């Protein structure tokens, strides 16, 4: 994905800046303040994407460890609420999208020590929430559009991994990098539905069209795995790749596990956790596998900034970057070479 694409549609981002800039003329601009010496209560606004939600988990764990007994309220979309709502130390987990009465009551009734918005850029939704919340200190990552309605503007280094950027608040309270990956215990409560030998988990698809990888190239990679190891392949795919997955199942028969019994992220976690490694161009599963401490081969575009921010965090990985903005231009030979090296490393470490 090019820098242009990685910014989630420049035209949309431009419109978002226009809206946030207009809101800054309506909302009260806040004076700069110091962070409190200790935090007793905090409300955090979580980003919309699944991968971003997974990357926020290490921060939440570190926050609770640093301030035992802290009251943590977390706002998220209904889409990724299941990731957070079972965490025992989160007091309230409420959806801000779609907007609802429970969320409205919460942000109007509570008084927090700190509001924290860890999003790198502007969001009209986050701006509206921030303006409504009662907090002694409102904290964001430094951004000229965000800054006017926040008291504290933390460093916003785009060369940092997103997991570490989320932890900028805790850097002021003695946290050091790299931060430890973490998943709530319920991610480990769903065993793999595959129980007939070793397998490689492989995610064929991702959300954006520029991240699509051709069927014939997947076929070449899968054929190599099956011919040069005793492992099978467990296929994850979206509805758009269903026909491709079915064709692979027809060709390789019982050596392909598809369809998978993974109706949600928890079941997918069980399958990935018991795999030998993950091959994926979907960063959501890459971040999940990293949190599970599974070896990863990730497929990325030539967008170095995007790679730096969303590569597998703090885990054994070999990643393949395209020569262009499109993942489809990756030569399958490069993936195969990295797979062979990864298997050799895993074999050596286990002997």
Where are these regions (language model features)?
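Catalytic machinery of carbohydrate-active enzymes
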Residues: 1-351
